């Protein structure tokens, strides 16, 4: 079945806007006339609503509305004979893939990633583990890890421990203690999130543990510095790389394959529809405003921290120069006849340095004001 085309998304947007959404969402009462105009039975309409309302808030945002409209048109046009039991991967918005994953986990009762393993089972497994841990990540494994990373990273490229819980549930040979140990290994600073490099190594450790290798007690020196960064990196200009789909080796199940199938990123599934491809529409404006708000928050935080640090440093330096100038002036009063020329030269030099410092401070204040004005214009 084809993905949603850009022209189709724009058509749905016109209908969506015509229903006058509030806070970019449509209530059931506003969507009901459109659904009933399809002349589909009530039970099918109820099922379509259930599939479309992914976050179960009783309203449909634009992405959810697109899902409902496509399901209706497919049945009315004969492309589908009935409402599917679950949303196909190509129709799941990337922004809501994690909700689909969570809903399926709850529906199947798999909401514990330790798989009901006992401590005795874990101890027996530990005795059978080998110590020949291999830090090398093959291209195939890296592609799989990147697919998992792309499915769970936030807008800053960071990944939370809880966001991978669906993956943990598929690891039948990895106890929760080993998962926690692997996380702590790549996250020595105990941040709430980890970056891409840390995530890939974390997944590699889980993969090795799933295949009978003991979780190591440390990481190579080449990785230690990377994992010990003092602050997370929020590089918004870095794009998510496009990776090729991994292939399974031999006949055994590839690491993360069942998990990727759940979130619609498996090699057997089509890629989900990109609802962001709506240039020139109000929906694009809404989406860009959200991104702008996030950028403004980050910029304001950075500006405040930078301004406070610069002001403090300049204030201390200025005070030191003023004290030095005062000391030299007192020396001049006490010993007016000794080295008078040298003292005057020192005073003039210090006064010049103070003036330069004040000018530098004024320039930085002007730059800060200009930055505040640019932020105000973007709002």
UniProtKB/Swiss-Prot annotation:
- The gene name reads END3
Q: Give each disulfide bond as a residue pair.
A: none
Name the protein family: Belongs to the END3 family.
Q: Name where it mostly resides.
A: membrane
Quaternary structure annotation from Swiss-Prot or TrEMBL: Component of the PAN1 actin cytoskeleton-regulatory complex.
Q: Which Gene3D superfamilies match?
A: EF-hand
Give one Pfam family: EH
Which residue stretches does the UniProt record annotate as biased composition, category Polar residues? 235-251, 264-276
Q: Where do the coiled-coil regions begin and end?
A: 281-379
Q: Which organism is it from?
A: Meyerozyma guilliermondii (strain ATCC 6260 / CBS 566 / DSM 6381 / JCM 1539 / NBRC 10279 / NRRL Y-324) (Yeast)
Region annotation Disordered: residue ranges? 235-276
Q: Name one GO biological process term.
A: ascospore wall assembly
Q: Which residues are Ca(2+)-binding?
A: 53, 55, 57, 59, 64
| MF term (GO), any | actin binding
Which keywords label this protein? Actin-binding, Calcium, Cell membrane, Coiled coil, Cytoplasm, Cytoskeleton, Endocytosis, Endosome, Membrane, Metal-binding, Repeat
Provide the protein name. Actin cytoskeleton-regulatory complex protein END3
* Limits of the EF-hand domain: 40-75
Gene Ontology terms: cellular component: actin cortical patch; actin cytoskeleton-regulatory complex; endosome membrane; plasma membrane
Q: Give compartment(s).
A: Cell membrane; Endosome membrane; Cytoplasm, Cytoskeleton, Actin patch
What is the topology of this protein in the membrane according to its UniProt annotation? Peripheral membrane protein
